[in-house]
């Protein structure tokens, strides 16, 4: 996740992918499991490096289907984030500088990110969505020869990312951190919905340029729910005779008005 100083804090659900190369320059992808350091900027991960292979680089977050061909890494920016708990999952890369000592890996961001805090969330809300002018999810490639590798969406493209969470009357505020590819965006729209037919707010940002490791911080938004009667609903109510006076008064009603003052 991300703290108030916009530094990445590790979580106990995090995992890394360690890519190792053999004598034939074929790569393996080994999962490194979280061990300690939740809530800190540094954490410890454990795993086993394949025998006879050399550690080359590490990727966050771990994805089982990540692969390397030549100098190109292929991974995914998911269009759907289920059971979202506020994690950023922003993709990062760390080059191994000493294959014999993996005790300190320094990660670099490979994308940008949008941060948005939503307050006064309705109890029925279950979905946060980002809709962009560019492709923001799908299969991505990374040029590993670059000094600062970045993700580029290349196939199975989507212009939407949806983060779903469990509806709750107790949670009134949520932070959303959604990774976005670098680039120039004519529009980026955020929505909070109930997952089907109700949109609680829509916020659109125009003409944004996002570079590697940029965080687009949107001022906090409050959800406001307004109940209104539509003309059709009013007509239906008036058509029901029970909503109208049933009979006129039998006696005339006289109202006296006294006016005083200088005229």
Task: Pin down the residues of each PLM region.
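Sec-type signal peptide cleavage vicinity
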Residues: 1-225
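Short active-site loop/helix that positions an aromatic residue
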Residues: 241
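N-terminal extracellular ligand-recognition/capping segment immediately after the signal peptide
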Residues: 229-238, 246-263
């Amino acid at each position: 996740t991300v703290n108030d100083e916009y530094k990445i804090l590790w979580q106990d659900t995090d995992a890394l992918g360690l890519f190792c190369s053999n004598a034939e320059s074929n790569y393996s992808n080994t999962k490194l499991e979280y061990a300690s350091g939740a809530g800190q900027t540094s954490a410890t991960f454990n795993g086993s490096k394949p025998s006879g292979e050399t550690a080359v680089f590490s990727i966050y977050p771990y994805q089982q289907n990540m692969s390397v061909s030549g100098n190109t890494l292929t991974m995914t920016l998911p269009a759907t984030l289920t059971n979202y708990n506020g994690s950023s999952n922003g993709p990062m890369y760390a080059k191994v500088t000493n294959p014999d000592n993996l005790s300190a890996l320094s990660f670099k961001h490979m994308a940008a990110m949008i941060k948005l805090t939503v307050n006064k969330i309705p109890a029925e809300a279950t979905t946060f969505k980002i809709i962009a002018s560019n492709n923001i999810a799908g299969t991505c490639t990374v040029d590993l020869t670059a000094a600062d590798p970045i993700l580029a969406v290349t196939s199975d493209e989507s212009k939407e990312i949806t983060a779903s969470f469990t509806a709750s009357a107790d949670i009134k505020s949520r932070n959303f951190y959604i990774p976005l590819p670098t680039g120039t965006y004519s529009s980026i729209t955020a929505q909070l919905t109930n997952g089907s037919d109700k949109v609680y707010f829509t916020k659109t940002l125009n003409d944004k340029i996002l570079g590697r490791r940029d965080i687009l911080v949107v001022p906090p938004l409050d959800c406001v729910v307004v109940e209104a009667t539509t003309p059709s609903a009013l007509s239906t109510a008036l058509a029901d005779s029970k909503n109208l006076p049933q009979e006129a008064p039998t006696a005339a009603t006289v109202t006296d008005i006294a006016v005083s003052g200088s005229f």
